[in-house]
Amino acid sequence: PSQAASSFSLLQAVSIIRITDPDLRKKVMELSANQPYIEEAAEFWIFCADFNRNHQIAPNVDLEYIEYLLIGTFDAGLMAQNALTAAESMGLGGVYIGGIRLHITELTEVLHLPKHVIPLVGLCIGHPAGEKPGLKPRLPQSMVMFDNQYQPLDEETLATYDQQMREYYQNRPVKAPFTVKRVKGWKDHIEDHLERSKLPFMLEYLNKQGFAKK
């Protein structure tokens, strides 16, 4: 089902690395902030933007334009969401692991990824250990969907949503191993996550893999 996801002009610029080797699982976990789900889950897949296959078919096409990175990233996201939706339809659970990018150069070497392939996100799949937690509250639709033109941030609506998230976090504290501050509400979460998501090596890595040079 995941492979049936929509693909930009059928370029199908995605590959999945299924990690079955226990030693490799442990290594990937260590490179991903030691998130235990990677070792514990029944299945662990890594979704990659992959233009290596297309490059072999059309070797004379210049893939250094950033548009190709956008295409591969978008396609990989669709496929990853389809995979989780299919798993949940069978009574399974899952969690995405964005932390695989924290040491992306070493991960690329461990997975033997060639040029024009980059690992974007991991997905752990398995039977939930306990009762499935409720979905995190989402931003109200008025803040994410606009008619005809972009709308400025509504501070009052944001404050209401932030309070909803404060109540949510009281019952389910943030437990990310690399959280840099105590998260009480959504605004705290944004400040925390943006701060720890700085990966200054990423552009150099992307260039090395043949992406985003133009």
Where do the PLM segments sit?
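Acidic, surface-exposed loops and disordered segments
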Residues: Q3-K214
